[in-house]
């Protein structure tokens, strides 16, 4: 089942560039920075807003959900994209704006794959809500499996 044939996730694993390296240069995608707050403070993470850096936790601006929808409108007008993701700069689930954005995106662009990343701490609380909003893919960052190491981080 190498190609995920028969899987209910086959469409996503074939089309989403995070799960299929062959799609990296073929699938247009947009990441929108609508989630500035985080629910943990990791020693290695410095959230920042600037135009100079390109790394996790840094963005050139924070978008309000309506601005993010306008951005997706603009990007889809320029060329085809199939994926829109919320990836910070904080934790997606620690921000009500994430849910507002996905609700609006579902109404304006229902065919796009909706994805997000999270540290997962709030996932049990919000998993049903994400499903109701049509979020197709959730990436959970795992920084440690040993609780002692996690405390150091």
Feature-to-residue mapping (PLM):
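Conserved Radical SAM active-site core
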Residues: 47-140, 144-151
């Amino acid at each position: 089942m190498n190609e995920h044939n028969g899987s209910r996730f086959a469409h996503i694993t074939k089309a989403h560039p995070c799960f299929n390296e062959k799609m990296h240069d073929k699938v247009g995608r947009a990441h929108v920075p609508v989630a500035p707050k985080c629910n943990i403070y990791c020693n290695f993470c410095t959230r920042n807003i600037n135009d100079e850096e390109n790394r996790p936790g840094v963005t050139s601006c924070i978008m309000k959900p309506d601005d993010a929808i306008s951005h997706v409108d603009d990007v889809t007008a320029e060329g085809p994209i199939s994926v829109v993701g919320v990836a910070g700069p904080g934790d997606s689930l620690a921000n009500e704006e994430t849910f507002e954005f996905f609700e609006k995106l579902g109404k304006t662009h229902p065919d796009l794959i909706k994805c997000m990343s999270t540290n997962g701490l709030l996932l049990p609380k919000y998993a049903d809500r994400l499903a109701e909003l049509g979020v197709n893919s959730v990436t959970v960052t795992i920084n440690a499996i040993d609780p002692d190491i996690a405390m150091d981080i």
